[in-house]
Regions:
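Hydrophobic alpha-helical connector segments
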Residues: 2-29, 83-87, 111
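Short coil/turn helix-boundary motifs
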Residues: 8-9, 30, 44, 125
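Amphipathic alpha-helical segments used for helix-helix packing
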Residues: 27-46, 96
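Short, hydrophobic secondary-structure boundary micro-motifs
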Residues: 35-37, 50, 78, 99
Length: 125
């Protein structure tokens, strides 16, 4: 769960960084599963709705962290739903990147790239 993986971090930027790193590692290790998950998100069948609800629940957990970070003055003001969806969207970005890089994908290099662009963009200076 997101709460368990982020509990040890004292600030909200670090919580988001942990989420991003976990997402990259999951895509790296379970590429086929993530491909299925993303493909099942679209559609109107019962299985699609279930997948959508689970994704929305996950995004909701990220949104809560973003909201709390904004309230504590650690994260820039913004649309929490959009920010949380953007962080979730890094799963798709990672999958595309992995397809292009193949076996050469360096998890930590990609993580630092996302940290420098996405996460640091949310940081209150």
């Amino acid at each position: 769960s997101v709460d368990i993986k982020t509990a040890k971090f004292n600030n909200y930027i670090d919580k988001l960084k942990a989420i991003v790193l976990i997402q990259i590692k999951i895509v790296d290790k379970y590429e086929d599963l993530i491909t299925i998950l993303l493909s099942q998100f679209w559609g109107t069948e019962q299985r699609n709705k279930k997948c959508q609800n689970l994704v929305y629940e996950y995004i909701g957990q990220i949104e809560k962290i973003v909201q709390e970070g904004i309230e504590k003055g650690e994260i820039k003001e913004g649309d929490t739903r959009a920010i949380a969806s953007e962080i979730y969207g890094l799963i798709c970005s990672t999958l595309v990147y992995k397809k292009r890089e193949g076996e050469n994908m360096d998890v930590m290099r990609l993580y630092h790239e996302y940290e420098n662009t996405v996460i640091n963009g949310l940081r209150v200076k």
